[in-house]
Design a protein with these regions (language model features):
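Transmembrane beta-strands of outer-membrane beta-barrel proteins
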Residues: 65-73, 119, 123-127, 191-195, ...
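Residues on the lipid-exposed face of transmembrane beta-strands in outer-membrane beta-barrel proteins
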Residues: 69, 110-116, 125, 174-179, ...
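Extracellular loop and loop/strand-boundary signature of outer-membrane beta-barrel proteins
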Residues: 94-100, 159-164, 228-231, 273, ...
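Outer membrane beta-barrel
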Residues: 119-279, 474, 503, 512-517, ...
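Outer-membrane beta-barrel "beta-signal"
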Residues: 530, 551-565
């Protein structure tokens, strides 16, 4: 499967599964499952609720300009007390302490999407403006001795970086132009080119974004992944600048290739955000406390400049996809730089702090390769899909931080983190039943099983994190009873979702740990397709654990209101 085009809004909170998973809904047609989005009909997605700014003919070419805007309000209420186990982690307690009880989110969000089309050419732009009021004031942190940031001055203040990533910002998402042509006998051949910020996703990932082939193609929005119940893979990828070329010689084959001229890391929670479990990474990460918390001048490692891959390092890929009868098949090869960091530490750099005993920085591994295949077909009334992929030069879960004799250290040859060759596989099914007794709209089901396996360690085996296994697996499924036209133009659904890691503590994915997971249930009402209201309860399986289950105490009740025009 290939998915391209517009990104969904970064922080959409209450959007529950309505029974049509993103594998289908992204295109709006079941017949397009598994085919390329490079065909001319798919280059500019038709948005059913868009406001038409202009429609006409110029130089015998159809011209359309459409603007669609979604506005949204969401709020979260914490339902669990902070865990003592997690509060005792001096380098991961800010999120718990800042939001000890009560309302933890109060977000106003706007997502404008502009599409312009001139014949077979066009442009697509989207952005987001958001305001989350709890991050604009003070918080409830009551532990100045374990407060990691040092530039704010007060433990009840958020860092400016956290305010920007969680509190208020205006973000450009998609920004690309495209063009294409039909040629050959009866115009059956198609070639398209898209240039700019966009998402291109290969494979058949349904829920487990970081485990699939598409994990190498775009950064993940961890903020959305942690705040949207049962987030589907395509909902949490972010666009990057790239060139995408697609050639369709006939109705069976599609050849596609891309080159990315922009690299971006995953969007992590800001330090001290409600779902933050590490006080040292990314936005707002400033120091690691290494001495007794009771010491007012506690010893610390101070953060210095991170090591990111150079823009010209080369991230690219190619695929061959085919529709053979009822089967959609794909072969893929790609090379990418990691969007998630490893942690290095070393000698102190002068910064004027008396308790400075060392430095730390984030290093993003480079030159990872993925080779994979996917298949999708219908089995009776259900759609069944799967993929398998191997990764070379993959960074593994290590016992960080990794001590470096020199700064900046290497993110390629000579890496300090463990590296290996791995295998990943996923299988999923989607099914929507006919009407049932007491459920006239039927029930929608979506499920996926994901596994990963460490084939061999090629470097730094001694740095593997202890207590983990070479094979791990997890599952996620949703069940959604639907009631259509309860009142004129009003549909109601009751989505239920469960994620559970049932095998192993992965040496490849540090979030896949046996006995952990989450569950959610709620009610969603849709009026005239443009108004949505949802209430959701979400909580977590397993005992709180600093390494294995660091947000186990962050259960919440949420309300979401949304309108598209």
């Amino acid at each position: 499967m290939t998915t391209t085009g517009n990104s969904l809004d970064r922080r959409s909170r209450g959007k529950l599964l309505s029974g049509i998973p993103a594998r289908y809904a992204h295109f709006g047609s079941l017949m397009l499952l598994g085919t390329t989005a490079g065909t001319l009909a798919l280059m500019s997605p038709q948005r059913a609720n868009a406001f038409n700014l202009y429609s006409g003919t110029v130089n015998n070419q159809n011209v359309e300009i459409n603007l669609e805007t979604t506005v949204e309000y969401s709020t979260f209420y914490r339902v669990n007390d902070p865990s003592d186990v997690l509060l005792n982690n001096v380098n991961g307690d800010e999120g718990d302490r800042n939001f000890r009880h009560g309302f933890v989110d109060n977000t106003f969000d706007a997502l404008p999407v502009l599409d312009m089309k001139y014949g077979n050419f066009g442009a697509h732009f989207s952005g987001e403006l958001y305001l989350d009021t709890p991050y604009l004031g003070t918080n409830k942190n009551n532990s100045p001795s374990t407060y990691n940031p040092y530039t704010t001055g007060k433990n009840t203040d958020f860092t400016s970086a956290t305010r920007n990533i969680n509190g208020e910002n205006a973000v450009l998402l998609d920004a690309f132009v495209y063009g294409g042509a039909n040629f050959g006998a009866d115009d059956q051949q198609t070639a398209t080119l898209k240039v700019g910020r966009q998402t291109l996703l290969w494979g058949q990932s349904l829920f487990f974004a970081s485990n699939g082939i598409s994990a190498g193609q775009a950064p993940l929005d961890i903020i959305k992944a942690q705040s949207l119940p049962n987030a589907q893979a395509q909902q949490i990828f972010l666009p990057v600048g790239q060139v995408v070329a697609t050639y369709q010689p006939n109705q069976i084959l599609t050849f596609q290739a891309y080159y990315q001229f922009e690299w971006a890391h995953d969007t992590f929670q800001g330090v001290g955000a409600y779902f933050s479990s590490a006080d040292i990474l990314d936005k707002g990460g400033e120091r690691i406390l290494v001495g007794p918390a009771s010491d007012p001048q506690v010893a610390a490692l101070y953060r210095i400049k991170d090591v990111s891959p150079p823009i010209d390092n080369g991230q690219f890929g190619a695929s061959v996809q085919a529709t053979v009868g009822l089967y959609d098949l794909g072969l893929y090869a790609l090379r990418y730089d990691s969007k998630a960091p490893s942690l290095y530490d070393g000698a102190p750099m002068p910064n004027g702090q008396a308790n400075n005993v060392g430095s730390y920085w984030l290093v993003y591994p480079r030159d990872i390769q993925i080779y994979g295949a996917s298949v999708s077909t219908d089995v009776g009334p259900a759609n069944v899909a799967g993929e398998i992929s191997g990764r070379r030069n993959m960074n593994l879960v290590g016992d960080a931080p990794f001590a470096s004799a020199t700064y900046p250290g290497s993110a390629n040859a000579g890496a300090l983190y463990p590296v290996g060759d791995t295998l990943a596989a996923q299988a999923s099914a989607i099914y929507a039943s006919a009407g049932l007794p007491l459920i006239p709209g039927g029930v929608s089901y979506a499920a996926e099983i994901a596994m990963n396996h460490l084939i061999t360690v090629t470097a730094n085996r001694e740095m593997l994190a202890p207590g983990r296994q070479g094979t791990a697996a997890a599952t996620e499924f949703t069940i959604t009873p639907n009631y259509f036209s309860v009142l004129p133009k009003l549909d109601i659904s009751f989505p239920i979702g469960i994620t559970y890691d049932f095998l192993g503590r992965s040496e490849i994915d540090q979030t896949m740990n046996h006995g952990t997971g989450n569950f959610s249930f709620g009610v969603s009402a849709t009026y005239r397709t443009t108004w949505i209201a949802a209430i959701t309860y979400k909580d977590y399986f397993g005992k709180a654990d600093v390494s294995l289950n660091p947000i186990a105490d962050r259960g919440y009740l949420s309300l979401n209101l949304q309108h598209t025009f």
